[in-house]
Every structure is written in C-alpha cells, then in structure tokens.
C-alpha cells in the first residue's frame, strides 16, 4: 500500500511540474511554415523543450512567434527556423523536416539553437 501511495504522489508531482509552464499551442503556427498542421503539432513540444535551454530559469511562458523556410523543399526534405519567445529571450530553433510514405519526420540540431535577443 505504501508503495502505491508513494507512486501516486510521485506521479502527481510530475504532473504538476509538467503543467507549470504556459505553451502557446495554437495551430497553424504563425509565419511561413510549409509543414502541415499535424506535423507542426507533432514538432511543437520538442521545439519548446529546446527553447528551455536558452530561457531564464524562472521563465514559464513560451510562444512560437514566427516560422520561416530556411532551406527550400527538395525531394520532400526542407528546413525551417522557428522563432520562440521565452519570457525576455527569443530563440531560433532550426528544424529539418522530411515527408515519407509513413508520415512526416523532424529533427532538431541542438547546436543550432540560438538566442537572437534578450531584453
């Protein structure tokens, strides 16, 4: 019984931690993304996790404020840069996309994430 109670408390604690942030999840995203809404949705939280790396530790509010195509679509592969506002900082997150028969795929290069402004 103690083990179950401890597990339940741990899960509740993790749930609270996960929802302690405010993420803008409105789709379609602003800007010129050519990823469809489903691919944007699948990529959204991964992009936000990379924005956490550059945000201030006390930052709780995150929003994608722009998207742009940085490498044009060739053979169903392209790259976009998503601009994410994280409180007083703005970060650019480069995302490589690829469409295959089984669906869309994406990859983020962690070394490509950059802070572009800080207030």
PLM features: what roles do these ranges have?
Residues 20-119:
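Cysteine-centric segments in proteins
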Residues 4-16:
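Sec-dependent N-terminal signal peptides
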């Amino acid at each position: 019984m103690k083990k179950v109670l401890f597990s339940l408390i741990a899960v509740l604690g993790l749930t609270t931690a996960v929802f302690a942030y405010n993420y803008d999840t409105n789709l379609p995203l602003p800007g010129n993304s050519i990823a469809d809404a489903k691919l944007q949705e699948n990529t959204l939280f991964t992009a936000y996790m990379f924005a956490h790396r550059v945000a201030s530790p006390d930052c709780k509010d995150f929003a994608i404020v722009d998207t742009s195509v940085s490498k044009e679509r060739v053979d169903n592969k392209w790259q976009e840069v998503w601009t994410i506002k994280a409180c007083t900082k703005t970060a650019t997150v480069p995302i490589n996309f690829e469409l295959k028969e089984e669906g869309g795929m994406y990859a983020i290069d962690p070394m490509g994430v950059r802070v572009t402004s800080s207030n």
